[in-house]
Regions:
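Compositionally biased regions
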Residues: 6, 119, 146-150
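A short SAM/SAH-binding and catalytic strip from SAM-dependent methyltransferases
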Residues: 122-135
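A short acidic, Gly/Pro-enriched loop at the edge of an enzyme's catalytic core
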Residues: 113-123
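Class I (Rossmann-like) S-adenosyl-L-methionine-dependent methyltransferase catalytic domain
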Residues: 1-56, 60-114, 132-139, 143, ...
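Conserved acidic functional residues
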Residues: 70, 117, 127
Length: 209
């Protein structure tokens, strides 16, 4: 528990430093890459994000961090930015203060306070589940089911420890396509597609209820 807390605090501090370094920049890439310029991230953006943005729909982003993916999601009717760390939500709010359709939600680890049941058309998370311990991922999968509509699209990036770059990253959790696939199915979702090759340390899964 203590080690997990220290890791969370370290990640928060790194994110806040990255925020402050980039506040004057027009585009947020942070130290993890800019989806406008890094080819694998551009692919994720163009296949798993932009086709689903719809001004009639509601969306959730889990762990928005510096807003590098949030900027592509602001076209939804309502976007719920969900994070455990209030400091990060505060920074994100300053960056997107002109966007009245963003709701900032501080959760308790794997819940969605204030988001109505069966109200979400699209849920996205990138750069967050790669760090989560597997029991938290399973808790999220249970909670997500209650807020999404039937037929909603859920897109999650997660750690793939079968890849050498994930093995070398001590901050990445113990996960793999086999484990993630089994967990998604155990939570009674239908897997639509997976991408296990585009990213050098992780994978992406899209599923629905």
């Amino acid at each position: 528990m203590l080690a997990h807390s220290k890791r969370d605090n370290s990640l928060t501090k790194r994110l806040l430093r990255a925020f402050r370094r980039g506040l004057s920049r027009p585009t947020y890439g942070l130290e993890w890459g800019d989806p406008d310029t890094v080819e694998p991230l551009k692919f994720i953006r163009d296949r798993y994000v932009l086709p689903y943005v719809d001004a009639r729909h509601n969306a959730v982003e889990i762990g928005p961090g510096g807003g590098r993916w949030t900027r592509y999601l602001v076209g939804f009717r309502t976007l719920y930015a969900v994070d455990y760390h209030q400091e990060l939500l505060d920074e994100l709010g300053r960056n997107f203060r002109c966007r009245s359709n963003i709701r900032f939600v501080r959760n308790n680890g794997a819940d969605f306070p204030g988001i109505a049941a069966s109200s979400i058309d699209y849920l996205f998370s990138f750069g967050t589940f790669v760090h989560l311990e597997f029991h938290l991922i399973e808790s999220y999968l249970t909670s997500i089911r209650s807020i999404i509509k039937p037929g909603a699209n859920v897109v999650i990036q997660y750690s793939d420890k079968t890849k050498i770059m994930a093995q070398l990253n001590k901050g990445f959790s113990d996960n793999s396509p086999v484990k993630m696939r089994d967990a998604v199915r155990a939570a009674d979702y239908n897997i639509i597609e997976e991408d296990t090759t585009s990213l050098w340390h992780s994978a992406v899964i899209r599923f629905t209820r």
